[in-house]
Amino acid sequence: QNGKSTIANVSKEGSMERVTMKFITEAAGLKIQQISFDKGAPRYGALLGGQVDALFEQPGDVRKFLDAGKFKPILTIFNERPSVFADVPTHREMGMSFEPLLRFRGFYVHANAPANRVEWLQWAFQRAYCQDSYQKFNESKFMTVIDSYRDTAGARKLINNSIAQYRDVYKAMGL
């Protein structure tokens, strides 16, 4: 069904999801029509209602559909299979060699923040991250499929690597 298959995706050109779909379609030699939705609910409804063939989404956002058996994962965008999706192939297993882009968020301080305040905040955030209640929340959203905590050096490395990836892709896409 080359060119006739449809996938619900976010509408923002240049988004992580759109860039990843570019990687997938180029690596697999596919044409897939991406149907844009700004909000999650219409994307999920499109798959539930049969208006699209597939959905690009992070698993935590559709957990209730996965748990209810209404959605089924068919591909993970990780270098290795996460244990919670042990029966779902990775993009690499399907012959795609691109490095996955990761969604990330962080905490930032003013550039002139005192060093002792920065150190205390780093300690507090790491301590909060390690709390059982937060780990349970992370597990409920499938946010433990990768190591999701980064210290300052790790965050800088992730951000800088992501910038380089996006820069190359945006240039190739003409953005």
Where do the language-model regions lie?
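An extracytoplasmic/periplasmic, membrane-proximal ligand-sensing/linker region
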Residues: 30, 116-175
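Hinge/capping helix and adjacent helix->loop/strand transition within the periplasmic-binding protein
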Residues: 1-42, 91-93, 104-139
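Periplasmic-binding protein-like
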Residues: 75-111
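Short secondary-structure capping/turn micro-motifs that flank functional sites
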Residues: 41, 63-64, 82, 107, ...
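Extracytoplasmic/periplasmic, Sec-exported soluble proteins
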Residues: 12-16, 39, 54, 58, ...
